[in-house]
Amino acid sequence: MSETLPLLLRAARGETVERPPVWMMRQAGRYMKVYRDLRDRHPSFRERSENPDLSYEISMQPFKAFQPDGVILFSDILTPLPGMGIEFDIVESKGPQIGDPIRSLSQVEALRPLQPEESMPFVGEVLGRLRSSVGNQAAVLGFVGAPWTLAAYVVEGKSSKNYAVIKKMAFQEPELLHKLLDHFATSIATYLRYQIDSGAQVVQMFDSWAGQLSPADYDTFAAPYQKKVVDLVKQTHPDTPFILYISGSAGVLERMGRTGVDIISLDWTVDMAEGLARLPDHIGVQGNVDPGLLFGTPEAIRDRIDDCVRKARGRRHILNLGHGILPGTPEENGRAFFEAGKTVMDRIGGA
């Protein structure tokens, strides 16, 4: 019976559900005391995300505290890079650091095809354990970084404010960049298939930095490779709902809808009603409460959730933030978000 499947999975597939499911991007993280305590004992991010016992424990922390409708693998979009021959570290307060940025054809040609079951068996183990632990109480989500965003990190070598290095490559050596993007698209599709086979029921692709592109350049350097990932995954896993998130997506929203994904995750700079009007009816939406609102009062959080859900009524909708929850957010406000999300239909009434 479909009713026994997790609420989030049913909603993501487009079934009629009793309320929008709710989870939060970065719901496992620094705003939770249990996470900070664990981080103090295990200061290396790569250890926390690549040790299966730690990754599993962290993934489950918000589920135990708040019972969200989705439990997402605790990992990072850069986790598959070493399996392709690119080493990285994540430095506290500095973010990702790539030891040897990719700037030449010889470096791109030296990249290995990703074999996740060999280079990242911990991911499969954690996803399987999460499925066993949450059963049908929540959907298990997997995720990846999109080719453009991965390329931005490995070409720049770190986070960037203006993306000058990768844009120089895009406009001076486009063939080189396309070769890198194509390699990432194939490998990321392989990684997503592995996640789904290991237990992920819904997957999300983060193209965090695609919002830094003009619409024309999005069409050239981001969208074709997003679509390649989606097409490859849909060939083997057509029934797994696929979500796409871009930070700062207002300028490319319609274009996102043409990538083949099932659900667009809206950031908070787009009004929910206006965003829906710009997308075809068959595409669902996720979001899109401003994460900054979680520094406000429980009443403000509740009112904004009510407004968001009202505007999305009648469309496939997963309630979420418009970006990851911010460090320093009061943990009780994270709880208030989940509680308000689960009780929203009591306040705004049924369909």
From Swiss-Prot:
In terms of PANTHER family, this protein maps to: METHYLTETRAHYDROFOLATE:HOMOCYSTEINE METHYLTRANSFERASE RELATED (PTHR21091), UROPORPHYRINOGEN DECARBOXYLASE (PTHR21091:SF169)
Q: Looking at the record's lineage, which domain of life comes first?
A: Bacteria
One GO term in the molecular function aspect is: uroporphyrinogen decarboxylase activity
Could you tell me which pathway this protein works in? Porphyrin-containing compound metabolism; protoporphyrin-IX biosynthesis; coproporphyrinogen-III from 5-aminolevulinate: step 4/4
This protein's UniProt keywords: Cytoplasm, Decarboxylase, Lyase, Porphyrin biosynthesis
InterPro entries found in the cross-reference section? UROD/MetE-like_sf (IPR038071), Uroporphyrinogen_deCO2ase_HemE (IPR006361), Uroporphyrinogen_deCOase (IPR000257)
Reactions mediated catalytically: uroporphyrinogen III + 4 H(+) = coproporphyrinogen III + 4 CO2
The source organism is Synechococcus sp. (strain CC9311)
Q: List the NCBIfam families.
A: hemE
Q: Which GO terms describe its biological process?
A: protoporphyrinogen IX biosynthetic process
Example of a GO cellular component annotation carried by this entry: cytoplasm
Catalytic EC class: lyase
What is the annotated quaternary arrangement, including any partners? Homodimer.
Compartment(s) of residence: Cytoplasm
Official protein name in the record: Uroporphyrinogen decarboxylase
